[in-house]
Amino acid sequence: MEGLKDKRYFIVFDDLWTIDMWRWIQEFAVASNNRKGSRIVVTTRDVGLAKECSGDSHIYQLKPLQPVDAANLLLRKSRKRQEDMERDGNIVEKLVKKCGGLPLAILMVGGVLATKKVAEWRQFYDHLPSELETNPSLEAMRRMIILSYNHLPSHLKSCFLYLSIFPEDFEIKRRHLVNRWIAKGFIKARGRVNIEDVGKSYFIELINRSMIIPSRVNVEGTVKSCRVHDIMRDVMVSIARDENFVYLTADDNVTSVTEENFRHVSYHGRKFLKECIDWRHFRSSTMFGERPIEPPAPLFLPSTRMLRVLDLHGAHFGITKKDIKDIGLFRHLKYLNIGSAKAYSNVYRIPRSIGKLKGLQTLEIRMTDISTIPNEICNLQSLRSIRCKKTHWSYLGLQPSMGCLMDMMYHQMITRNSHEKALKSRMPCFRHWSIYKGVSVPRGISKLQELQTLEVVDIKRSDANAIKELGELVQLKKLGVVTKEATEQKCKLLCAAIEKLTSLYSLNVDADYHGSLEWLHSVSSPPLPMRSLKLVGRLGEMPDWIGSLTHLVKIYLGHSELKGDKTMELLGTLPKLMLLGLRQNAYVGKSLVFGARAFPNLRELDIFYPDRVREVIFEEDTSYQLAKIQFRGGRCVEFIGIKHLPRVKEISLGLGARVAKLGDLQGEVEAHPNHPVLRLVEDWSMHNIDPSEHEALEEELANFRRQHQQERSTNNRKWWPWRQRAQSVFIFHHIQGSNVEDDGDDFFSCTSHDEDAC
């Protein structure tokens, strides 16, 4: 390389693996004082290594091919035409998806398919995992993935293989994954660095090494969930099986294995491992399929007592009390998730034997009927996370007016619809049942000094001393509470507790759509590290203390009934605010004004059913960073000043959105130098409403609502007259899978955001 010192050169270093190699290249291979316009290009799979080689502006991240381009490449490589695929056209789509849009994978698969008839393509797709192991034409692709695995540091190899327990194309939430890694002992604390932060760094490192694919990113650019490339997963499962690391059960698998030292089992079908297996070796059990048909319940045998992780969240059947009655036997459990997101759960009480799980760190009991945390929980001083948002009444198809047992029982007797079965299954739990989505916490909660996440606490049903003790949870970072119908005294105790939580960075207070949060004005010194704030309930005006939250990144307000200029002026001063969510009468003024020099860091604006807002105005020199506007459910609203938003990329008008002057808005969008996208969910004809006609319609609707409210109030006070109305139809929405309201630090839905704060 000495001869390059005085020459102009162009060098490509392909597939660089380590930073040490790059440092050697810098020190010995390439002259640093060459001023002849030379260039060096480095290719690598590691984003972190790329950043060592160059600044962000000189890094090009190769994107997967678009589906059409990927399909064309596959057909061209396999020497087939589109006409050849008419009988089984979707097989191309499936193969392209399997390859993840990666050109190298498509070329290798296409090369194999070139030797096969079209009729054989589906069989090849079905047996691709075994083809990767046996087909010489695919050996290079398998070898490339194994090489990537072998280059992982030792602390990442187990973390990576653990991903093989999840089904193909499954969205894996970072929070769940990191908590499971911690429970399994894959992650160790480093000095003063929080163990969760170490786990997050492992997660990011796997992304940077292109071993996993980001699937959901929040407004700050933080990756909240990931997926594993299909072919990468096939090879990963093969490695995990060869190393006796994970055993997967599925309907097409045999139900016995000769190896006796698998560490993790994942159920994807209805098959069950035979009892001849030595269960004592298993350390984690995860359920994704149907209830096993053999052996029958209970799900877990006494011989599985060495389990560290038990996760039933992905089960396609309702968890029952019988399934978890012996939970106290699993003394080594560190991670427990018993709330199924795929089916009704009939668990309404935590067994008191849970107090024997002294090492338990994570307790997930959401999507259950559990409404009370037992006293025994206070003995589990290793607990770091309790998430216990219970099944809401709407999940059963009930109305909130059914506040008493008599109403619900009578409703069941006189109706014959799809809810009857669901209600019958819950009859034993009615004495534990409440219509609120929180759970009561016991006295002694302050003993849980390691606790960092606690949600959702029902303040009304919790003891006053327990509420006071919340302020003693000095490590608490995320708190969710419901205050519907809570007394003023308990709300004041909650205020005092919040002021003591100096580590809190996420707070969610829900008083329901007609409840009051005006007691929040009495907060004098809020937790200054707070980054995420969600308030649902009437505020009247914005509390002054919100202006002191200089680290606040996300704020969501619902049913707040805010008005006047103070609201937007105060919010506009928050220097780090990136996401503003206003929902259903959060603001009740006619003009929502984003003033000059306000909202310096705002990136996303989400407005949902602003019943009284008629215009959204962006003044000059406002919201310089605003890139995305989502508007749903508002009527006769006019957007003014889009031209003043230099970085806007997308304006989305969702279901129920009605724009008064859509043509004017489209004109501003078309004239904008940034060429933003204007998305319309509903037809153009639904917009351009005449304001005068709209005002008359709104008045008529308001009168109807008032009359309906009076009738409902009267009928709730008189049970017998209500009986005659009970046969009304109740609309039931059964939400499954990743669409279930779950984690979020961006508040609205799992499909677009994630509720985990920061």
Question: Could you describe each region identified by the protein language model?
Answer:
Residues M1-L65:
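A conserved switch/coupling segment of P-loop NTPase cores
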Residues G3-L4, Y9-F10, N34, D251-R263, ...:
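Cross-kingdom leucine-rich repeat
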Residues W17, T44-A50, G269-F272, P292-I293, ...:
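Short, polar loop motifs at secondary-structure junctions
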Residues C99-M108, P153-S158:
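The conserved phosphate-sensing helix
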